[in-house]
Amino acid sequence: AKEVLQRVGLFDTGFHLYGWEDLELGERLRRTGVQLIKCPAAVGYHWHPALTLDQIPRLIEVEGERARMGLVFFRKHPTRRVRFIIQFTWLHRLLWELLTLGGLINEHSLRPLLRWLIRHGYPGTAMELLRLPLNRIGVRALFQEARLAGLR
């Protein structure tokens, strides 16, 4: 395993903001023909603190970072596969616009419901609900960054 990582390279330090460096390494490994071995006994966790309303501005900021780093990923691997991974397709753009009713469901309109869910012990449900506008924000940011960079 060490030899394979040395051959394809470690995490790319060009990913200096949040997002995609792990999947980009995986894409390089996949392209060299490394076989995926599933190990159901292996467990991994992504720990996130319970959602609070104070976290929302940072979560929105992270979506902008993910958009910028998504383009770093796409420039390295300009494939349809990577477009789908980073949600850089018109299908994704349409999906998140529809699911948020064109932005009517957003971090502001959801705030009372999010507050209620958090107050009543459902911060996880609140976070899942907040993912709708966050995904819309992220996909819009990705398309905006791509336009500024001259990518389509």
Per-region residue spans from a language model:
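Short secondary-structure boundary/hinge segments and terminal tails
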Residues: 23, 47-48, 92
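Short, well-ordered alpha-helical packing segments
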Residues: 27-30, 64, 71
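Non-membrane alpha-helical structural segments and their capping/turn regions in soluble enzymes
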Residues: 20, 57-68
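Non-catalytic, C-terminal membrane-associated alpha-helical segments of glycosyltransferases
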Residues: 61-65, 82-152
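Active-site donor/metal-binding and catalytic loop motifs
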Residues: 16, 35, 39-57, 69-73
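Juxtamembrane/interface motifs at transmembrane-helix termini
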Residues: 27-29, 47, 102-106
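A short, conserved alpha-helix in the catalytic core of glycosyltransferases
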Residues: 3-9, 14-43
